[in-house]
A protein has these predicted regions:
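Sec-dependent signal peptide recognition
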Residues: 2-8
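A conserved hydrophobic position in a structured secondary element of the catalytic/binding core
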Residues: 9, 113
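C-terminal motif of bacterial Sec signal peptides marking the signal peptidase cleavage site
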Residues: 13-16
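Active-site-proximal alpha-helix that buttresses catalytic centers in soluble enzyme cores
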Residues: 19-106, 118-121, 128-131, 135-142, ...
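Periplasmic-binding protein-like
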Residues: 108-112
Length: 165
């Protein structure tokens, strides 16, 4: 009986230490057209490949994007690398999407958004208002939120350039 109790304790302990990492990115550089749904520039396409290269060893299990050409094109190389579909979400429904992801405890998620939504997503995940809207000129940053147990850690990095310029 003591062995069973000890085994159950270890299973519970290690399952509660399970970590989840959310990788949040603003879409890559978009074309400066008058379109409501612009494509990525050539530089933006390279940034999307850089993001894929950075995420290659991260064991991504889910990919989420808004239904805009620029966000889907940013997520596409990672989607193809992992053979995962791009799950679409509404920028207006991002809070409920985050709540659903937190409830499922799905590991290693990529979420692609916009300059005025990435901050909201990070704040919703961490439960703090640590971020504000990104500058319109900021591309190539990756916001990493790690959950271990009930604690969240947040860091911002610049995605390394791996694609020839």
């Amino acid at each position: 009986m003591a062995k069973v109790f000890h085994l159950l304790f270890l299973v519970f302990f290690f399952s509660s230490c399970k970590s989840t990492t959310y990788y949040l990115s603003r879409h890559a550089e978009r074309a400066g057209t008058m379109s409501n749904d612009p494509q990525l520039t050539a530089e933006g396409q390279k940034q999307a490949l850089d993001l894929r290269d950075y995420l290659r060893g991260k064991n991504i299990k889910g990919i989420y994007s808004t239904n805009f050409a620029r966000t889907k094109a940013t997520a596409q190389p990672t989607s193809e690398w992992y053979s995962l579909p791009i799950n679409l979400y509404s920028p207006n429904g991002a809070s409920s999407m985050i709540d659903s992801l937190k409830a499922t405890n799905k590991n290693n998620i990529l979420i692609v958004g916009h300059s005025n939504t990435v901050d909201d997503l990070v704040n919703r995940l961490t439960g703090a208002n640590s971020m504000t809207d990104l500058p319109e000129t900021e591309y190539g940053s990756l916001f990493i939120v790690k959950k271990k147990g009930g604690n969240y850690r947040f860091e911002k990095i610049k995605v390394p350039q791996t694609t020839p310029r």
